[in-house]
Regions:
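Long, low-complexity N-terminal extensions
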Residues: 1-99
Length: 99
């Protein structure tokens, strides 16, 4: 995952070596639940806040709607290629929105 002059990019390589590009994705346990949420609710040109909420909705679906803010970390890379993380209060507020 990353961002360059062409915009944001998210890739997954499967065990056979095939590479797939996604606009939103999840891996690991709960992937199917996450991808179902993303496929229904993802929209191009989402705001940063909308993207965070969508990601948390996916995580919540994968965790049987029992998402705990103390186990969530959120990092953002914006179009200006600036990286930042949300602090624990910001994460708790974002998680509360999806409950």
């Amino acid at each position: 995952a990353g961002i360059d002059a062409g915009g944001p990019h998210l890739y997954e390589t499967d065990p056979s070596g095939a590479m797939m590009a996604y606009k939103a994705g999840g891996i690991g346990a709960g992937r199917n639940e996450v991808m179902e949420v993303f496929e229904k609710e993802y929209k191009d040109n989402m705001s940063e806040a909308q993207a965070v909420t969508l990601g948390l909705k996916g995580l919540s679906a994968a965790n049987e709607n029992n998402l705990k803010p103390e186990v969530v970390e959120i990092a953002i890379i914006n179009p200006e290629k600036e990286f930042h993380t949300l602090n624990s209060d910001e994460v708790a507020k974002a998680v509360k929105k999806v409950k």
